[in-house]
């Protein structure tokens, strides 16, 4: 006997409760100017007095897609309490720095962390360094978007690589009609799950990811923490054709503020 819709809804509620994670959602807005240390998508970065903008092997500057000022986030257990985290990708590359063979490679992306940002270069000094050569980026070069953060809790998304395993185990514990994968379910049941489960299609820090294609991680991947997700908005941000970018990190590395090994992916 097939489970009823009410029984399936109860199962999804149980799964959601069992997989709750903290997530910080991000809304953007256009502004005239932001401080160099403000949270932002795009725009001009904070650069220490003795620092330099990251560059590729030919000496061309990377493009900063995001800067997060940790002190501007709501109280959370995801990010460091203080400092600036910057996300950079290579300019002038059709894949926006994505390495399909080694998504943790830093050849096409960099994550920089400044635990105690002191007085840095002035805007004029930053502009002298930050001159993009190709301007082939997912955002209009130099245009900046201010960020507003909201914290909540949310269960696993349908896109997450571990969803099928978690859901299948819970289904088989609950119902006599056993399955090996979610794809063993009737189409109408899968459609109902799509309506009930969080999609995660938004800019976010933490929580579970969203993909337009599929999760690049293997099951039980050590890259469990969603450091940042940037969605396309059709207006100011465009990853390919309405795609989404994700940056994942090992939980221990995040706790130790070690951002050398971050898994970067985007798809559309």
Task: Give residue spans per PLM region.
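Preference for intrinsically disordered or flexible, low-complexity segments
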Residues: 1-268
């Amino acid at each position: 006997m097939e489970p009823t819709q009410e029984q399936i809804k109860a199962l999804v509620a149980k799964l959601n409760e069992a997989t709750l994670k903290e997530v910080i959602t991000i809304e953007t807005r256009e502004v005239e100017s932001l401080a160099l240390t403000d949270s932002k998508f795009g725009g001009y970065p904070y650069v220490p007095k003795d620092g330099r903008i990251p560059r590729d092997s030919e000496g061309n500057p990377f493009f900063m897609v995001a800067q997060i000022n940790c002190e501007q986030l709501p109280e959370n257990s995801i990010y460091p309490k203080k400092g600036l985290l910057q996300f950079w990708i290579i300019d002038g590359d059709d894949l926006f720095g994505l390495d399909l063979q080694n998504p943790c490679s830093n050849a096409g992306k960099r994550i920089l962390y400044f635990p105690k940002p002191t007085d840095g270069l002035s805007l004029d000094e930053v502009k002298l360094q930050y001159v993009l050569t190709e301007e082939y980026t997912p955002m209009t070069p130099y245009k900046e978007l201010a960020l507003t953060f909201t914290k909540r809790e949310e269960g696993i998304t349908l896109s997450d690589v571990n969803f099928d395993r978690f859901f299948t185990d819970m289904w088989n514990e609950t119902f006599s009609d056993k399955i090996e994968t979610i794809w063993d379910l009737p189409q109408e049941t899968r459609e109902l799950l799509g309506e009930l489960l969080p999609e995660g299609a938004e800019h976010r820090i933490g929580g579970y990811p969203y993909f337009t294609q599929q999760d690049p991680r293997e099951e039980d991947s050590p890259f469990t923490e969603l450091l940042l997700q940037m969605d396309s908005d059709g207006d100011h941000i465009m990853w390919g054709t309405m795609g989404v970018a994700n940056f994942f990190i090992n939980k221990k590395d995040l706790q130790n503020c070690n951002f050398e090994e971050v898994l970067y992916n985007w798809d559309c």
